[in-house]
Amino acid sequence: MDSSNIRVIAFDADDTLWDCQGHFEVVMHHLYDELVPWVDRETAALELFSTERKNMRLLGYGVKAFTLSMLETAMRVSRNEMPAETINDILQRCYSLLEFPCTPLPEVELTLKALRDKIRNHTAPSTALTSLVCFTKGELLDQQHKLERSGLQHYFDYVEITSDKGEAEFRELCRKLDVRPEEMLMVGNSLKSDIAPALAVGCQAVYIPFHVTWQLEQHDHFEHQRMVQIDHFAQLLDIMNAHL
């Protein structure tokens, strides 16, 4: 990967800047427990995955889509026998996902601050990193609120929230930012949504795995000459050091 011409660094949000999937996993496992009178936990997990995948085209990503899939799975698998109070409990647990703390993951704020300072102090902006961007997918209000709860919003020059993240969305982001794809570096935890489409349109990428991956985001691992994998967030500064 060549960092010498990078003008924009775009960061994914969920499970890159803060933990998101971990909170969803807790709620999902509660559903599996509640469905034990009808099916084993493994079957319950498969049923939820099947429901989420079926609903993806119409509902997209986010808490609302997840909530509808959770309730649909609960009622279908239990053959509408699950008590109303249990259904309500599942609903309330899903609601809680709209307010969980978005505490920045280790080294995230330190790294963003260092990059922000370098941009502010650089004396050759025509050849230097000029912008930090948050590029995330999901429901507009939910993603906006999570960014606010994280306290990280002031580090970003621009925030783009989309319903999906594919090649078309990456091309559109480059157009809006007026950069060539090779001048943008995408940093994220999802090979499927962050890394593969960014590389496909010509961007560079830094892959930072998270300890848990949503089943619908899983992707076979691969290597690429324009991709670097890091183990912890501050390594991004090492990668950018020659450029900064």
Q: Model-found features: residue ranges?
A:
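Active-site neighborhood of HAD-like aspartate-dependent phosphohydrolases
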Residues: 1-47
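Asp-based, Mg2+/Mn2+-dependent phosphohydrolase catalytic module
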Residues: 1-9, 109, 113-118, 133, ...
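Short, surface-exposed acidic
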Residues: 36-51, 79-90, 155-158
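A metal-dependent, Asp-based hydrolase signature
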Residues: 51-96, 114
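A short mid-domain helix/strand-loop element embedded in enzyme catalytic domains
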Residues: 87-93, 104, 139-144
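Active-site periphery "cap/insert" segments of enzyme catalytic domains
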Residues: 97-114
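Intrinsically disordered, low-complexity terminal tails and inter-domain linkers enriched
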Residues: 117-130
